[in-house]
Regions:
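Catalytic-core "active-site belt" of small-molecule-metabolizing enzymes
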Residues: 1-123, 131-160
Length: 160
């Protein structure tokens, strides 16, 4: 996503805008340095039109204010006990462990490195578990990241 996509506030965009909770990785010195929680927003109607035409999805994914993130904490790379939860209005909406990751962080890093360079501060959004849906104003999102069953990140976003 472009830098203009990153926001401190989660905004209601339009009716067919969907959220995706994701485990995110912060890059430093071309390696994964930190881990955080992110919400990736998608304009579903535009995405579907682009898919049908065989076109890239940038218009649906890279629009202004289409991503919000928690803080990032140091990450040692051990994904075996990694877990993500997303609650909306106190209801568990998405839940994923490392077992559900189609591509593990090392593979994602390797693949991306094969065609582009990383700079310090780049963020990799690792993909989305089931539970993608639309949202509305005043919804309260709570993203959580766990390692070894211990809560290491908890970030709340209220939709404006």
């Amino acid at each position: 996503k472009p830098n203009s996509a990153i926001s401190d506030t989660l905004y209601y965009i339009q009716e067919d805008c969907r959220f995706e909770g994701e485990i995110c990785f912060l890059i430093k010195d071309k390696k994964i340095e930190g881990i955080g929680f992110g919400l990736d927003l998608t304009k579903a109607g535009i995405q579907n039109k682009m898919k049908k035409k065989g076109l890239p999805w940038e218009r649906a994914k890279g629009f202004d204010k289409s991503a919000v993130f928690s803080e990032f904490v140091k990450f040692d790379g051990n994904i075996k006990t990694l877990e993500m939860k997303l609650f909306i209005n106190d209801i568990l909406t998405q839940h994923a462990t490392h077992d559900l990751m189609i591509y593990k962080p090392a593979k994602i890093l390797s693949e991306i490195s094969s065609f582009m360079s990383f700079e310090d501060g780049d963020i990799i959004m690792s993909g989305t578990p089931k539970g993608v849906a639309t949202y509305k104003k005043k919804d309260i999102f709570m993203g959580e990241i766990y390692i070894d069953g211990k809560l290491i990140i908890s970030k709340s976003f209220e939709v404006k």
